[in-house]
Amino acid sequence: MVLRELLSRTEQIDDLCHLFGALGFQAAWEHVPPGPWLGTGPAEAAGVVRAALVARHDVFRVFALEARDPERAVRAAAQRLAAHAERGLACALGAAPRRLLCAGWRAAARGPAIRVAAIPLERPPGSSLETLERFSPRPRETALALSLRVGEALASEAVTPRFFRAFRATLERLTDRLSTPRSRAERHTLALTAFTRVLFLYFVQAKGWLDGDRRYLIRRFDDCVAARRPFHRRVLDPLCFGALNRPAADRSGAARALGRLPFLNGGLFEPTALERRHGAARWSNSDWRDAFDDLLERFHFSARETEGGDAVAPDMLGRVFEGVMDPAERRASGSYYTPAALVREIVRAGLEAVLVHRLGLAPAAAERWIHRGQPPERAPDLRRLTVLDPAVGSGAFLLGALEELTGLRCAAGEGPACAVRRDVVAHSLFGVDLSLTAVRLAEVRLWLALIADVSAGPDDPELARIAPLPNLDGHVRQGDALVDPLTLARALGGAPAPATPASELERLSSARRKLFGLAGAAKRDALAGLARAEAGLARELLRAAVAALERRSAELVAAAKDRDLFGRRRGLTADTRALLRRLRASRRELRAAAARLEREGGAPFFAFESHFGDVLARGGFDLVAGNPPWVRGERVPARVREALATRYATWRPARGRGFAHLPDLAVAFVERALELAAPGGSAALLVPAKLASSGYAEPLRRRLAEGACIERLAPSLAAGGAFAAAVYPMVLVTTRAEPTGREQVATALGARSTTPLIPQRALAGDGPWILARDAVRVARHLGARCVRVGERWRPQLGVKTGADDVFLSAQPGPATRPAVRGRDVGPWRATPRVHLLWTHAPDGRPLARLPPALAAALAPHLDRLGRRSDYRAGPAWQLFRTALAYAPCRVVWPDLARRLAAVVPDPEIVPLNTVYGIATREPDDAYALAALFNSRWLTALARLHADPARGGFRRFNARVVRALPLPPASPSVWRVLAEQGRRGESDDDAIADLYQLDAADRRALAAAPDPL
């Protein structure tokens, strides 16, 4: 507090004596003539009015300058100190905004490096105060040692992408230093576990809780280096496993020698199963020196999620989690960091729906409480409100729910905030994730949230009575929220979950509550009690599921043995035979799980009914919120796809012409979220925006529109840049309740009374959800009155090679044709940038024998070409989907573009498989379609139905173009359109007249260029 007050009172350089005196320097005041000291040129250039020596430590001197350009002045002074190899610091005061500028120098390979730090004088963040504190001289410290430390403090960086790169590089280096276990994935997990502990210690250290020293770890490390002792064995091991995880009275002498340290409980500070199996991972002093220099001491740490962007705050653990995953792993898991501001708005939207539908508040009262902090006169009790994140990631949504529920309860009169926050974690928050790393990071963020506002300072005698960190083992679990063997077995067997005795459910709930606040031997007993409660529920659930599978199998066999009217046995159809195989496989899996339960004593896998059965018995969770994985169905393993199709009614391939796209994994998560929500409860999810338009999501859209209340359907286009996935996000908030037909859907986040609304009934029926109401009216009117493109022509994809590196060349050759990708096509233009080895005859069939030059080029690749996924039979050099390549008349457009952009290409040009096209019999048809497709009206209509992608792009695939209306046009009018196409122009007004669009229709389409 002293530093904050001194900074706020600093008005002129004379006041810096008091500031540096408070830091432990010897105060001084000696005038220094600016010109002779700095040099006339630098002094005049910076506008230095006066300079003075204001503090010293040994021969380390602190100078203050008053100047017109304060940053230029301190840089000049630091350069002067460096030129004379003097130890010191230069300071100046800046205005607008008021700030203290400090500059120093440190030796570098290419000469002295000048470092400048700017410290706000009003409301300085914790990171700035830490920088000042790092200037403090230590007892008996030499000027050289102080100068080196000041240089390190000035070199500390604000958080930039460099932090995340440095984190990943450090983690990879620590992983590579380990020799065991053999699996690199396990070594990576061990390194991440240990490094997560150190990160947590840096956050705790920032509060001054490690022996009152905000520089505790680096000082202990320096002491170990000076004494030639291993830092990991002498400090980290006893700190984590002998001090922080034990009450002070139970610590060994070595642990007590580490200083005054709080008891933070086990959890993070106890060996994991992997560490118990392979032994704790340890690194040398050299490895830790690199970690300190490259990462830990380079950036500021703050235990507050809301700390300014110049500090490493706990919410960055989400981005760290995303950063330590390589891109292929991230795409496979669909795990993406969600920005905190977006999380807050999604959680608020979900809680607002819960307050209205689950707890009975009036909409206006719920909005005031959520968005203005004004509780109703009789506020409902939120102490048992439950929130689940079924794909918890790094815990962003649980943290968001923690802050919002704490705020609501404190606004209603509960307090203090730290006690309410702990109670929310104890009773309201639950999470699941497949990744153990994600579970650990979520726990760390929840623990940090609990200590962030604890007021005990480093010298506070209450430090010893800081509440130990709670045990979250019963709240955040590793497991599969979508498909566990029990729910899959019930889907196959067609049996509901059995009723569970209330005594068993109370035993589970009581065990979780008891475990939350215990430590030591009592904690171990409570953990065993929780495991027994979960195992007891799992045992009965497994028994009932096996019985259901056996009944269903017996029914199928009995039906197969039944005889028809002619006395013949009916037998098993192919479908029933496949179902019987899966029933028996599921039964084997459950029996093996039951045997493992009896052998090992714990539940063999995570299931909501066994681990959170007490919550489900009350109907379910009040709010299910999160950012579930976005994974294209084609990337999901075949066995998992089969399970999803069995388990979820809405997870079905798109039906229609052409390739049947598999649903995104997010489809199943939406259905699952509503299952887990209690009646009147809500699901608030961040999902791919393409769920509103893709054909594969139509069963889900129909189910939501007809069987639930849709509260929000809000495209988050503004968040697309901050969001790292490859498609636009959309916020979907639904309530588990039957719609009445009067529901209104908000199409934006924020206070509901200020957002645009559309009737939910407008979302019913087939087709995409379109939020631009006036444009929808125009589109439906045209659809009812006009013939569609798909009724006359068939849009199709261009040529697919299956081996672009073999068939495509930058240079033309005797056996090549110019080719275009989607990015090479625009309105009225197709610019070939590659050339395709052409292996087909003019009629489209593959050549039976290749010309010698072509045969020689392809000969080394024939085995590979025969293994392409599209290859079935015939010459190995054949290409696929060649119809557009040899069609004499065709119009083509890119699959991915900001607008529908069409061209009639030269006959020699081959469209590749990121280009769609239509082959026509007559050239006039191709040119007329180009004129229509390039008009603003067809682009607007196409964008209404096209799936969104990043950067404002849309996917203008065959489904979208098939549905476009064709204007009623006589042959003469069609010829006029064709002439426009030949000239490379579209007459928007004339085309609007052809469609009979009045002024209101044109305004509606013009106003909705990007409706979703």
List the predicted regions and their residue ranges.
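Signature of N6-adenine DNA methyltransferases within the class I
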Residues: 1-36, 42-47, 75, 86-89, ...
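Class I S-adenosyl-L-methionine
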Residues: 139-205, 219, 281-424, 438, ...
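A short N-terminal interaction module
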Residues: 246-335, 523, 530-567
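Conserved SAM-binding loop
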Residues: 389, 431, 685
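Flexible, glycine/threonine-enriched loop-and-boundary segments that flank and lead into catalytic domains
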Residues: 182, 186, 364-386, 422, ...
